[in-house]
Amino acid sequence: GKYIYSRGCANGKRVQALCGAKNHMIIMPDADMDQAVDAAMGAAYGSAGERCMAISAVLAVGDDTADRFVEQLAPKVRALKIGQFDEPGVEMGPVITAESKARIEGYIDQGEKDGADVVVDGRGLKLQGYEDGFFVGGTLLDRVTPDMSVYRDEIFGPVLSVLRPQSYDEARQLVINHEYGNGTAIFT
């Protein structure tokens, strides 16, 4: 991004380069949970989470909301059909490089060390016939806190972090204060 920005500007071009993103989904206690879960599945795990507008952080307002969200989402993440793009029914393919796979799994390792609950673990995924492929399974982390690298950094992979703010104002402040704010969805 920085290279493209500098080259474009040096050549008199108008350039907008967003060099990092952390998109949030706020889920209020009165949200239609089925709708929020379905939206999270596509937004977090589509394209193996490797797109700039992927949702990578869910701010479920209140513990009851977070519990309901995680309880409904976890089985869907576990059921993701992962494989090569040309296989029938595949919902998620590999990440782009071996380095990306190692980096993503390193973030999951660090999140676990920092105290996040690994509800669904996508590390170490091996698919028959593609044992050396760059596959990372859908990962769901709960009880993530704002100081954890899995929240602070852009992971760019199929990892969804759930935080548990206790009010809309607290959730809103998390979005506002995040270094990589980009897009936010609110379910209410």
PLM feature spans:
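Conserved glycine-rich beta-strand-loop-beta hairpin in the small C-terminal domain of fold type I
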Residues: 90, 133-136, 153-159, 178-182
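Active-site donor-binding acidic/aromatic loop of nucleotide-activated sugar
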Residues: 161-163
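Cytochrome P450 core scaffold surrounding the K-helix E-X-X-R motif
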Residues: 147-152
